[in-house]
Curated annotation (Swiss-Prot):
Family to which the UniProt record says this protein belongs: Belongs to the IlvD/Edd family.
Any one of the GO CC terms: cytosol
HAMAP family, per database record: IlvD
Pathway: Amino-acid biosynthesis; L-isoleucine biosynthesis; L-isoleucine from 2-oxobutanoate: step 3/4; Amino-acid biosynthesis; L-valine biosynthesis; L-valine from pyruvate: step 3/4
Phylogenetic classification of the source organism: Bacteria, Pseudomonadati, Pseudomonadota, Gammaproteobacteria, Enterobacterales
Catalytic activity reported: (2R)-2,3-dihydroxy-3-methylbutanoate = 3-methyl-2-oxobutanoate + H2O; (2R,3R)-2,3-dihydroxy-3-methylpentanoate = (S)-3-methyl-2-oxopentanoate + H2O
Keyword Iron on entry: yes
Subunit structure: Homodimer.
Naturally occurring in which organism (per UniProt): Shigella boydii serotype 18 (strain CDC 3083-94 / BS512)
Name of protein: Dihydroxy-acid dehydratase
Length: 616
């Protein structure tokens, strides 16, 4: 009998009770010698990115059992950041990542499962499952629900592409008519799937490809397209092979920590920078690396950001391209191919298919492959039909986008910019760094200096922006919204969207110890570390202080003397128990969120829990 983890509950006379319960789930004597594989689903009717997942777990389970395994499905929670946005619900989004990771650990370890297929999709679900996978270190394959089709509507006699962010911006723009706002709202999110731009969900699903834990096409193949079904069928078959390789052949190369190595993490971050992914991916990669016991830090990200160019530009950084266009251009593998030809990737990595990076590129890079089936898969396109059904259409682009000079994905020679889409800035109130999505910053404001307008909650900042109290040239500072201070590190999509609505998108900066939605663009600097609630110097900024931002030189500076900052710190400490807390904010915080805050670290550590507080 192979040394399967599940043998703990399926073998031995003393496990008669456990076997009796397994039998009640449908298992038979023949099943007790097979690996038990958890199908970790995240179906919910609350989230368009997950509304179509109900039957997909069964699809995977059937393949697992046909290949000689026993499949057992369970679900995690899934928070929709877009619906939770702009009110107290956003306090729960980032903490849900830890809850998801823990719930996967609880279920898998409580029942001694041997391996997992993780069916994820949206913002915190993929990271939570990724953290759990690297924590547990048992064979795993990720297969996500896939991206939503881009919205489309006709405005001023022109067909334009839309997404969730457009609905937010137009809904708050006083110059937009009610009828146009309603038209955009009804058109922005037409199908099931994760929101159609390079937002957090799609960024993370792309990164699982670069980490080697999902199959080619996972990050870009539309949720509605019939071709996506094959990813689920393959995952069910392949996970049984990986499981048997590890348990029966003692092949540790099948384990996620050996696939998602430090070299793979560097490749994933390189991809993220090149494609202008969400800043949230920085948080999640840092957190996942800690679970894998990999020394991967903000310093590594900073080094990569200084040498990786931007080779792909997608909404929200441009409305020309959405995920369906990235797929047509070759998807994640297409971007990795250009990065490899530029000499920017670690080649000694493998994926869950057992392929090295060169082998993967040879087979799946549209610029290299001779496989017509692969080319056909990357021509999978949108149908433009409203639906919540997976695999419901089989439309295809007439041609691939293989124009590496002017297309969606560019070669090094024709890069959108020599600097990548993300940058780490350091300065006297961001000693441990902060993050900006440079892909979404207009060239005219890469260097920016202005007076601070300080707010101690997102709500106050939104009220000020919509009330006309923020003017061109201002630097909006929103603090005490970090992991501990919020708690929960809210996304600031509404403040950044409303700045655009008020015509200030290229005239103001926004700085926060909170974070941003993947849908954010503009001069939006987040993850300021240490956060205000941890004694960070962002808590010392006062209205009118000049703040200088210098993205090309990776700097951010509060133009106040060291002596003055020391005096302000002394005054803050003199507040005693009230030190490093908001002065005028009333916010009801539940016990669950207070428990999260008590262990939360700042963003530069991935906003994970501080194990040292538990003696770990």
């Amino acid at each position: 009998m192979p040394k399967y983890r599940s043998a703990t509950t399926t073998h031995g006379r003393n496990m008669a009770g456990a076997r009796a319960l397994w039998r009640a789930t449908g298992m038979t004597d023949a099943d007790f010698g097979k690996p038990i594989i958890a199908v970790v689903n995240s179906f919910t009717q609350f989230v368009p990115g997950h509304v179509h997942l109900r039957d997909l777990g069964k699809l995977v389970a059937e393949q697992i059992e046909a290949a000689g395994g026993v499949a057992k499905e369970f679900n995690t929670i899934a928070v929709d950041d877009g619906i939770a946005m702009g009110h107290g619900g956003m306090l729960y989004s980032l903490p849900s990542r830890e809850l998801i990771a823990d719930s996967v650990e609880y279920m898998v370890n409580a029942h001694c499962a041997d391996a997992m297929v993780c069916i994820s999709n949206c913002d915190k679900i993929t990271p939570g499952m990724l953290m759990a996978s690297l924590r547990l270190n048992i064979p795993v394959i990720f297969v996500s629900g896939g991206p939503m089709e881009a919205g489309k509507t006709k405005l001023s006699d022109q067909i334009i592409k839309l997404d969730l962010v457009d609905a937010m911006i137009q809904g708050a723009d006083p110059k937009v008519s009610d009828s146009q706002s309603d038209q955009v709202e009804r058109s922005a999110c037409p199908t099931c799937g994760s929101c159609s731009g390079m937002f957090t969900a799609n960024s993370m699903n792309c990164l699982t490809e670069a980490l080697g834990l999902s199959q080619p096409g996972n990050g870009s193949l539309l949720a509605t397209h019939a071709d996506r079904k094959q990813l689920f069928l393959n995952a069910g078959k392949r996970i049984v092979e990986l499981t048997k390789r590890y348990y029966e052949q003692n092949d540790e190369s099948a384990l996620p920590r050996n696939i998602a190595s430090k070299a793979a993490f560097e490749n994933a971050m390189t991809l993220d920078i090149a494609m202008g992914g969400s800043t949230n991916t920085v948080l999640h990669l840092l957190a996942a690396a800690q679970e894998a016991e990999i020394d991967f830090t903000m310093s590594d990200i900073d080094k990569l950001s200084r040498k990786v160019p931007q080779l792909c530009k997608v909404a929200p950084s441009t409305q020309k391209y959405h995920m369906e266009d990235v797929h047509r251009a070759g998807g994640v593998i297409g971007i990795l191919g250009e990065l490899d030809r530029a000499g920017l990737l670690n080649r000694d990595v493998k994926n869950v298919l057992g392929l090295t990076l060169p082998q993967t590129l040879e087979q799946y890079d549209v610029m290299l492959t001779q496989d017509d089936a692969v080319k056909n898969m990357f021509r999978a396109g949108p149908a433009g039909i409203r639906t919540t059904q997976a695999f419901s259409q089989d439309c295809r682009w007439d041609t691939l986008d293989d124009d590496r000079a002017n297309g969606c994905i560019r070669s090094l020679e024709h890069a959108y910019s020599k600097d990548g889409g993300l940058a780490v800035l350091y300065g006297n109130f961001a000693e441990n760094g902060c993050i900006v999505k440079t892909a979404g910053v207009d060239d005219s404001i890469l260097k920016f200096t202005g007076p601070a307008k300080v707010y101690e909650s997102q709500d106050d900042a939104v009220e000020a922006i919509l009330g006309g109290k923020v003017v061109a040239g201002d630097v909006v500072v929103i603090r005490y919204e970090g992991p501990k201070g919020g708690p929960g590190m809210q996304e600031m999509l509404y403040p950044t969207s409303f700045l655009k609505s008020m015509g200030l998108g290229k005239a103001c900066a926004l700085i926060t110890d909170g974070r941003f939605s993947g849908g954010t663009s503009g001069l939006s600097i987040g993850h300021v570390s240490p956060e205000a609630a941890s004694g960070g110097s962002i808590g010392l900024i006062e209205d009118g202080d000049l703040i200088a931002i210098d993205i090309p030189n990776r700097g951010i500076q509060l133009q106040v003397s060291d002596a003055e900052l020391a005096a302000r710190r002394e005054a803050q400490e003199a507040r005693g128990d009230k030190a490093w807390t908001p002065k005028n904010r009333e916010r009801q915080v539940s016990f669950a969120l207070r428990a999260y805050a008590s262990l939360a670290t700042s963003a530069d550590k991935g906003a994970v829990r501080d194990k040292s507080k538990l003696g770990g």
